[in-house]
């Protein structure tokens, strides 16, 4: 096979080293996602005249929920046999292994506990607004996956295929880039929806939009990925696709309910 026409990807996952300390690209993108998220939520709280001191508390809840949820999601959604046999490995986040579906569940749990401590900021109110930083963060983290040469696509002969030198010499779909681009586009749409179209006033509309769009895209893009779970290879759909279906259904229901509520308010 002539591979000269494809993109040869041999990027080191390490950004640089300072003595015994190594800074990895994935870690930089992960940290950047939270810093950008903190900035965005600060602007949202200023816009809606909420206590700025609450931003730090929400930030801590979000970090804990994202990391714990994403880690547990990877361990039990994708490699349950291994981690049940080696439970001590679960806490070794630095070895890699985070799942976006688990991250979503972790964020939902974290926001639930945060909103209970802030009665004036309901669960629905917070969830609608964290869609903005969540979507930007998702796009950045997928770039981190690209630098790690992980979550790779299936072999292909398309002209833009990547050869991940740290994996093999097969041209593959750069599915990390596909997802990242889609997530950045959804982020741009949500920014318009919140700042220009004022969708934040319709409870559940932003959250429903992100669940429907993100997990519909995720369902479709899974067809271009190699299977990540250590089971279910004989099933027609991947684990990621099965997990995406309920998220899409919930998103559609939230959009329907939000639009219906807005229509009732107009007629009342």
Curated annotation (Swiss-Prot):
Pathway: Protein modification; lipoprotein biosynthesis (diacylglyceryl transfer)
Annotated Gene Ontology cellular component terms: plasma membrane
Enzyme Commission number: 2.5.1.145
Entry annotated with the keyword Cell membrane: yes
Keyword list, A-Z: Cell inner membrane, Cell membrane, Membrane, Transferase, Transmembrane, Transmembrane helix
One Pfam family named in its UniProt record: LGT
Cited function: Catalyzes the transfer of the diacylglyceryl group from phosphatidylglycerol to the sulfhydryl group of the N-terminal cysteine of a prolipoprotein, the first step in the formation of mature lipoproteins.
Family (UniProt): Belongs to the Lgt family.
UniProt-recorded name of the protein: Phosphatidylglycerol--prolipoprotein diacylglyceryl transferase
Gene: lgt
């Amino acid at each position: 096979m002539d591979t000269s026409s494809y993109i040869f990807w041999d990027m080191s996952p390490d950004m640089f080293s300072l003595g015994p300390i190594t800074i990895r690209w994935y870690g930089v993108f992960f940290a950047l996602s939270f810093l950008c998220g903190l900035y965005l939520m600060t602007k949202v709280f200023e816009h809606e005249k909420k206590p700025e001191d609450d931003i730090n508390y929400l930030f801590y809840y979000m970090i804990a929920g994202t990391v714990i949820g994403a880690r547990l999601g990877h361990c039990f959604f994708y490699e349950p046999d291994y981690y049940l046999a080696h439970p001590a490995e679960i806490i070794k986040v630095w070895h890699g292994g985070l799942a976006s579906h688990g991250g979503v569940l972790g964020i939902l749990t974290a926001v639930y506990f945060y909103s209970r401590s802030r009665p004036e900021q309901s669960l629905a109110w917070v969830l609608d607004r964290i869609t903005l930083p969540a979507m930007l963060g998702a796009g950045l983290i997928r770039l981190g996956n690209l630098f790690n040469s992980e979550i790779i696509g299936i072999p292909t002969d398309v002209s833009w295929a990547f050869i991940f030198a740290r994996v093999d010499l097969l041209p593959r779909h750069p599915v990390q880039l596909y997802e990242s681009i889609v997530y950045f586009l959804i982020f741009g749409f949500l920014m318009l929806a919140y700042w220009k179209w004022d969708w934040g006033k319709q409870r559940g509309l932003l959250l429903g939009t992100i669940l429907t769009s993100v997990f519909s895209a995720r369902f479709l893009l899974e067809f271009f990925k190699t299977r990540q779970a250590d089971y279910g290879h004989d099933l027609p759909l991947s684990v990621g696709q099965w997990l995406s279906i309920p998220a899409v259904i919930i998103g559609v229901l939230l959009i329907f309910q939000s639009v219906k509520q807005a229509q009732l308010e107009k007629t009342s």
